[in-house]
Amino acid sequence: MNINEWEKFSLFQWQECPSIKILHDSVGNKISCIGKSTKRIAIGTLDGRIVILNSRLQLIRDFYACEQGIVQQIYITADQSALCCVVLDKQNFVYLQFWSLNPSKKTNSNSPLCLYEHRLYGIPNPPFPATSLYVSIDIKTVVCGFANGLVIRVEGDFVRDLGSRQDIILREKDSITNLILYSPKKLFVSTTTQVMVYKIKNNTKKVISNHGIPLFCSIQYQGKYIMCAGGSFLSVYTTPDMQLQNTYCVDGTFELLFSSFGLVFVVYTRKNGENGLENNSSIREIKALDVEKRYVLYESLLEQSYDNIFFNSFDCIFFSSTKVPCQLIRLPSDFVLCKMKGKKEHKDAFKIANYLGSPEDTIRECALAAAGECRQQLNFQDATYYYIEAIPFSDSAEIIKFYLEKKLIKELTSYLEALSAKGFAFSHEISTLIYLYIKLRKLDKLTEYVSGCPTEISLPILRKYKCLDQMELLGTIRKLPNVCMEVYQEKGDVEKAFNHLQVCNLPELLRTSNSFGIWLFNSDPMRFMKEAIRNIEILNSQGKDKELSNILKIVYLGIFSQNVQIQLIFLDELLKSKKSENVLKFIYTRKLYALMQKELQHSNPQNELDALQIIHDSQGLLDYESSILCLQAVSWKQVTDLLYSHLSLKEGQDDSLIQQIISDPETVKTLSETYSSEDALHVLKFFVRERSITNKYEDILYKILEACFMQFRIPIQHVLNILVKDGTLNFCFLKPLLLKWMNDYETRIHQNDDEIQVIKNDIEKKRQLLGTIQDSEKVCDNCEGLLDVPFVSYSCLHLVHRDCATETVCPKCKAGYLDKKNSHDQKKTSTFSELFHDFESIDSVML
């Protein structure tokens, strides 16, 4: 990929730094090499000095490593505790040195301490300059490259100066430009013409690139890449396999390659033939590259006078002999975004926000603004892209409406797909996308999409537009047997429908829609009946009586109701296995009803015989009330009488009083001692009904009637209301009983008359007694008010108002007691008028 194709963002800005000019002037043009780390910068000079700066470019060390010598290469160790350098002394000897960067604890001095010094042998005299230096992470190995192609390795404990061993591992014909020990056994070597990997253990080398272009600078970037620059090309290799990942090209020649701010900076020169200038004139440019994301984050012209560059991980300063030093600073991301928004560069703002890893809300805001910009420019394809990136900030309802108005179906589909993929599609968006898939005939996408959509949204749309295959898939995935059956019914695929019954829950299916059962029954009655019986037997074996009863009602009443023959076969099959009492009651009742239907269709005496057999086989497990009602349509007297008899006996079996009377009829004589008149009427109703069916228990019925009249003295009208319901009762049956009742009434009337006479005599005696009392003494012995009638007397002959007689003990003397005859609660007596009224009721019965 060509570097000119990268997008350009202004994330950096120049800033003059006059305060550090003095520092630069102190070393001036004597700089020979620079070593950097995250916290320090080390500068070597041509007069043997080493100047160490901190991250703020403040001087912290300034010492001579070799007086009157030259510092050729500097390397700061990975832990930044020591500095390694290659120096050339005044006698042209080359030395390898290690200097401590931390204050000495023994001497309490801040002066640098030389930890190790070793003369390098094998270098011709006069020596070629050292061009590259690399120290391993564990500070146990140092490799140094020279301009004559020589590579020397020194191994030892340099920090503690415990000795070392020197080897010449390579002799190349070209100058060494860079060395990187990226693993303990592999050394990256670049020369001015080729790139290679040297395996230290095997003493072998593998040439990676040999294109003849001078390669004079290379760096290790983020521990993952090794980059080599030469001519117009920048090659990026991955470690540790050293595979060429990318090659970038510039319209010029590379001068410098370094890493700072986590980016790769390249400085190159190119010829300038623009603006009327001569073609042989050249300009310098600097670019900041993000190698992984392939962005040019900064691009600027660079003055020719800037000949020295100090840089570390977070600083990059350019020095010139004629101008004030300038620092390249990285702008805050918020500032860059605000600047772009102010210029309405919304697209670039979105890309910058993405690159900088801004908060998601910030990225979405930028994307939404960029979408609006593209929409104004009628660039709907890009607008869709930004709308997607702005989810969920984008107004989906407004976008759908706009796209539909403009008939931008493709863009709308893309937007809705992204909305669904990000989980922000709701009912309106989901239904719209399903509709688009159907109309665009994208059935594969429709099938995939509906499998993950809510059923309540997708199913109605699929049903409306007859997307049967998708409905079947949805029913299979979501385990919706009714949906699958609906598809089979729509297709008329009976065989597949019956096969589906093998794996689905038939009761659940029929509860959802009875139309499926009717369709299957009409298609193949016997096959459906067998399937229904199979499901019923499964429920029966599991003991699920409630569900079994429900499906029986659904299948029998809703599906088999029009086919009597199937009903009888179905019920006979069910009776072959053991069932609960409730289920058997339903089966026998419906079987009796089916026979009645059969009789209505074609009369046959055998039908009544079969009905009698069903009643006998049911052993009381029959719904007698409903059976009696339904059999009113046919003239089966024997069946009806038998049902009434069984019903009566069934009711009597649950009544302890009736069972007691049946077992011992003499109990009736003492019925009033234990039971009330309501109980007597209840017993009377039962025996009247039972007699009308079987002509049994006449003697008990007579005794019950006698008890109602004589013991409980129930008004005859209540008794007659019960008796008239029985058409078999006649006056001959009632005559003896009525005569006895009349005699009893006469006796009671005479008894009442005698009681009245006794009361009258008592009143007369009281009146005479009252006449003997003096008028002055006729006061109430309780309230001492004037005594008037009515009054009561105590046994002690004290008299009180009737209202004052609230106690049974005399309130005057506390010795007497209230006369019982005075407080006698007279019962209501029967009169001849009442008797004659009852006679009229009897006459109405006889008539």
From Swiss-Prot:
Zinc finger (RING-type) residue numbers: 780-814
CHCR repeat intervals: 387-526
Intrachain disulfide bonds: none
Keyword Cell wall biogenesis/degradation listed: no
Top-level taxon of the source organism: Eukaryota
Compartment(s) where it occurs, according to its Swiss-Prot or TrEMBL record: Cytoplasm; Nucleus
MF (Gene Ontology): protein-macromolecule adaptor activity; ubiquitin protein ligase activity; zinc ion binding
Keyword Ribonucleoprotein: no
Keywords: Cytoplasm, Metal-binding, Nucleus, Zinc, Zinc-finger
InterPro entries with a match to the protein in the record: Clathrin_H-chain/VPS_repeat (IPR000547), WD40_repeat_dom_sf (IPR036322), Znf_RING (IPR001841)
Any one GO CC term of the record: nucleus
Protein name: Pep5-like zinc finger protein C16A10.03c
Source organism of the structure: Schizosaccharomyces pombe (strain 972 / ATCC 24843)
